[in-house]
Amino acid sequence: MLHLFLAPGFEEIEAIAPADILRRCQLDVKYVSCGPTLEVTSAHNTTVTCDLMFDEVDFAESEGLILPGGWPGAKNLLEHEGLRDVLVRHCREGRLTCAICAAPMVLGENGLLEGRRATCYPGFEEHLHGAELVPKLVVEDGNVITGRGPGAAMSFGYAIAARFAGWDFVRKLQEGMIFNP
């Protein structure tokens, strides 16, 4: 199971596009609320009803954690203590940890990008402590995948999907979705 975290102020395309792609690959993705209720409102006033509250999730079996950006969504993720503990443990155990746009700052501020290649939304580079900054849409380094911003949301989703379904399957999916990388 994959867990995609939503905090108030998240970026819609960075939350919806990757989940859609992963579900098209028959992967189980759950939206997890890092807010006070299951309903979380985005940076652009779209409300999404999550599957689970953060405190309801058993992360022991999680195969991947996904953080969308957006503002103040990424800041709200950074300030969520429970999420910080889960992310650090999960990433250090070598499990898939993904963040896009401003959200890689959550990884960087928690020491999870030290010695890794990563990307983020322009202006957030100072938060990627110890990372080698790579100005690409998507950067993969071991168990960490980072994405640059809203325009990279589909490429980010495909990169995550390929970890589970393989690139052959993902390329066929891209063709069906009229995506030309």
Task: Tell me what each language-model feature is.
Residues 32-53:
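N-terminal beta-loop-helix "entrance" segment that forms/cooperates
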Residues 10-15, 39:
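Short N-terminal binding/cap micro-motifs at the start of the first secondary-structure element
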Residues 1-4, 10, 24-33, 52-53, ...:
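Active-site-adjacent pocket-lining segments in enzyme domains
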Residues 19:
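Histidine-anchored nucleotide/phosphate-binding helix
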